[in-house]
Amino acid sequence: MSCYDLCRPCGPTPLANSCNEPCVRQCQDSRVIIEPSPVVVTLPGPILSSFPQNTAVGSTTSAAVGSILSEEGVPINSGGFNLSGLGGHYYSRRCLPC
């Protein structure tokens, strides 16, 4: 059971966005000539795959505060949901008092 299961909700509503798309690419086949008799064998090309991920995590409060600060001309991080300075305890693993 995680620490967050033990705490009653007391902070802003969580906001998360995640993207996970698999990428598969097959390369060209290879041809090999085996001696002494001239035989051509076709070997299938390798299949390469990866799973790039893009995730943004924050809260509705941090998004609202960022919007207010940007309207007032205060420079904010263009990365979006940055919680530094707006309650870094969201990264903590232990329960903080509400």
Curated annotation (Swiss-Prot):
InterPro entries: Keratin. It comes from the Eukaryota. GO terms for molecular function: structural constituent of cytoskeleton. Keywords: Acetylation, Keratin. It holds the Pfam family Keratin. GO terms for cellular component: intermediate filament. The modification N-acetylserine is found at S2. The avian keratins (F-ker, S-ker, C-ker and B-ker) are a complex mixture of very similar polypeptides. Belongs to the avian keratin family. This is Feather beta keratin. It comes from Cathartes aura (Turkey vulture).
